[in-house]
Regions:
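N-terminal beta1-alpha1-beta2 submodule of the flavodoxin-like/Rossmannoid cofactor-binding fold
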Residues: 1-77, 81-93, 97, 153-179
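Short, glycine-/small-residue-rich phosphate/pyrophosphate-handling segment
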Residues: 104-143, 157
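Internal, active-site/partner-interface "lid" segment
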Residues: 143-151
Length: 179
């Protein structure tokens, strides 16, 4: 099963990226992982550029191909001003018209210092609007740097929770009817 991971943060030393990197080391058997690195390459969403028959920009076509090929997603997003970063929302706006998305399972992670509940709620609303299957096993890891050990591994309690969330994603992918 193929999973696409997306960090909503553009920071080079992002806690959300560190959380995705930690998750990549805890994958259930049979799960492969690809981290999307192209948020900065996406042009601003303009519905005029996404009309039937018009070719979308290359960066958008690449994102769509990766999302369509994935059996599930993991999104780790910070919280900025009680919301989702604009770069992540922009990427999701480009994906709204993809007919292959409804029902795909998505696991949400958040490593914001204060817990990120506002961003999680906003992101969940957007993903539900896109008809994605949002897992209840979403995970927040406030103050993540305190939970990271030497080499970027999570402390055992946090690692167990993240592994359980990834197992729930794997189960949701297995339950989804073939497309």
């Amino acid at each position: 099963m193929r999973v696409l991971a997306i960090s909503g943060s553009l920071r080079s030393r992002s806690s959300n990226r560190a959380l995705l990197d930690a998750a990549a080391s805890l994958l259930p058997a049979g799960m492969t992982w690809q981290t999307y690195e192209g948020l900065t390459e996406l042009p601003y969403f303009n519905p005029d550029d996404d009309e039937d028959g018009r070719p979308v920009p290359l960066a958008v076509a690449d994102l769509r191909a990766r999302v369509i090929a994935a059996d599930g997603w993991v999104i780790s997003s910070p919280e900025y001003a009680h919301g989702v970063p604009g770069s992540l929302k922009n990427a999701l706006d480009w994906l709204v018209s993809c007919p292959e998305l409804p029902g795909k399972p998505v696991l949400l992670l958040n490593a914001s210092a204060a817990g990120g509940s506002f961003a999680q709620a906003a992101l969940a609303e957007t993903l539900r609007t896109m008809s994605l299957h949002l897992l209840e096993d979403s995970l927040t890891a406030p103050f993540l740097p305190r939970k990271l050990q030497e080499g970027g591994a999570l402390e055992p309690g946090a690692a167990r929770k993240l592994r359980d969330a990834l197992e729930a994603l794997a189960a949701a992918i297995r339950r989804r009817p073939p497309q």
